[in-house]
């Protein structure tokens, strides 16, 4: 959980005065974005490796300790654990980076309106699932989400699907970030 907070703060601070300094020193927006993405990947990879090793060792010596991956998918598969955590950290970093870029790009009033609209969409989605959609549709959506996270109908776990899901979500957020950074002016 501490790593989530660190990666989130890193993502939020990934766009700062460094952007203005790099633009003024001749770096292109593409290189700035690639450098930021590389920084997130390097730090996320190291942190996920450390969390994987620490989580598995702690669970081995203290069976009451559980890591996030261990609770969801179980222990024993270290490589999927490391890749899953890496992609999860990349997803969190990309989400916060996109948020920081959007807040910087939009003015304060528009940013607040966007936050209120997103909160309204979450409440609307909850209301749709609870009161509007039929139980069959909700069950199909739940089944799709379960399969996207790797849980198959026979009780087996497919590690490829959650890795692809996390990768695609992170890629969407990074593409959104790149689209914003391409149009951002230096203030």
Regions found by a protein language model. Give the residues of each.
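Secretory targeting signals
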Residues: 1, 39-106
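Membrane-embedded or membrane-proximal helical elements that form or frame transporter/channel pores
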Residues: 1-14
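Hydrophobic alpha-helical transmembrane segments
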Residues: 3-4, 75-92, 153-171
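Helix-loop-helix units of permease transmembrane domains in multi-pass membrane transporters
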Residues: 15-41
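Central hydrophobic cores of alpha-helical transmembrane segments
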Residues: 50, 108-122
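Juxtamembrane non-transmembrane "cap" segments at the membrane-aqueous interface
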Residues: 53, 57-63, 122-144
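Short, membrane-exposed interhelical loops at transmembrane-helix boundaries
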Residues: 69-70, 135-158
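Junction motif at the cytosolic side of a transmembrane helix
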Residues: 99-105, 169-187
């Amino acid at each position: 959980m501490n790593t989530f907070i660190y990666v989130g703060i890193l993502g939020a601070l990934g766009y700062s005065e460094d952007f203005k300094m790099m633009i003024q020193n001749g770096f292109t927006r593409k290189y700035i974005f690639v450098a930021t993405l590389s920084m997130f990947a390097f730090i996320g990879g190291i942190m996920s490796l450390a969390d994987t090793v620490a989580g598995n060792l702690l669970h081995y010596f203290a069976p009451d300790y559980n890591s996030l991956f261990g609770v969801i998918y179980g222990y024993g598969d270290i490589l999927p654990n490391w890749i899953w955590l890496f992609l999860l950290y990349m997803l969190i970093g990309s989400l916060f980076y996109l948020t920081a870029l959007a807040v910087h790009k939009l003015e304060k009033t528009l940013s607040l309106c966007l936050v209120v609209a997103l909160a309204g969409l979450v409440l609307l989605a909850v209301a749709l699932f609870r009161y509007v959609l039929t139980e069959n549709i909700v069950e199909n959506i739940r089944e799709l989400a379960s399969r996207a996270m790797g849980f198959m109908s026979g009780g087996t776990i497919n590690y490829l699907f959650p890795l692809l899901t996390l990768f695609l979500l992170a890629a969407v957020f990074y593409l959104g970030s790149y689209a914003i950074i391409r149009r951002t002016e230096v203030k």
